[in-house]
Amino acid sequence: MSVEDGGVPGLARPRQARWTLLLFLSTAMYGAHAPFLALCHVDGRVPFRPSSAVLLTELTKLLLCAFSLLVGWQTWPQGTPPWRQAVPFALSALLYGANNNLVIYLQRYMDPSTYQVLSNLKIGSTALLYCLCLGHRLSARQGLALLLLMAAGACYASGGFQEPVNTLPGPASAAGAHPMPLHITPLGLLLLILYCLISGLSSVYTELIMKRQRLPLALQNLFLYTFGVILNFGLYAGSGPGPGFLEGFSGWAVLVVLNQAVNGLLMSAVMKHGSSITRLFIVSCSLVVNAVLSAVLLQLQLTAIFFLAALLIGLAVCLYYGSP
């Protein structure tokens, strides 16, 4: 039974165990990204260039793929694969690059809370493109599960945390005295719709080409991350003056890069052997990991809305993957 049908790929128990471990690891690493990034902040801001961190992440992925290919060269299929099979991954890298940059530009046209809530529409766009492009049909039960995921993400973004109460006397912070009002401009709404469509398209398109090609996953990743390095090097070179390439990097920043690189490789395995829908569940379930780490590392306080979001995620998983 396949992931799309609600099962776990693989017939043998060891393979099921490895797949389950991969899903748990990917969920944990995805959820750890934001808290680890917050620990990098100095005086309320990231001290290094985001473009250099992204480029380092892509380089790390590329090196890990190359090492994997060298170690397992004896298991390669006979014959040299035609390099034209690398071409489709250029579009995949371009879509991911556009998606990552849109996230930055969106912040100019709406407040962070509005972005966090409305960006959950990418769950719906991914599901729609998954059905249209890959020819899969979702049952009413599975459709309801995805709606619950969207609701859970919106709940979590709208009030899953609150700042710890400051009992010490002192002047109120500027952010507290003048909170940013909820707002979104017409251009921001258009960009948000574009972001959700590109997010869904990048996921579904990558799944499509990975499953169509009979090539080792490590080789496909090598193609993808080679284009990713080229694209992000161009973005870094064109980003204008700023801190040096490694300026501002700390131990936490290195951990962020390694975490993102390894999780990217795990997510590619999900796309190859699972589905874009599985990826959506990983991202949604990672909210729980994010919340726990934020509470432990950043002393943020969980609210009742967080537990509502966690309940909705649990219901969605049971509906989608449980027996009818």
Curated annotation (Swiss-Prot):
Pfam families reported in the protein's UniProt record: Nuc_sug_transp
Lumenal topology ranges: 40-52, 107-142, 202-214, 272-279
Protein name per UniProt: Probable UDP-sugar transporter protein SLC35A4
Keyword check for rRNA-binding: no
Gene Ontology cellular-component annotations: Golgi apparatus; Golgi membrane
Function of the molecule: Mediates the transport of CDP-ribitol. Does not exhibit CMP-sialic acid, UDP-galactose and UDP-N-acetylglucosamine transport activity.
GO MF annotation terms: pyrimidine nucleotide-sugar transmembrane transporter activity
UniProt gene name: Slc35a4
Positions in the Cytoplasmic compartment: 1-18, 74-85, 164-180, 236-248, 301-324
Assigned protein family: Belongs to the nucleotide-sugar transporter family. SLC35A subfamily.
Catalytic reaction annotation: CDP-L-ribitol(in) + CDP(out) = CDP-L-ribitol(out) + CDP(in)
Cited PANTHER family: NUCLEOTIDE-SUGAR TRANSMEMBRANE TRANSPORTER
Complex formation: Found in a complex with SLC35A2 and SLC35A3.
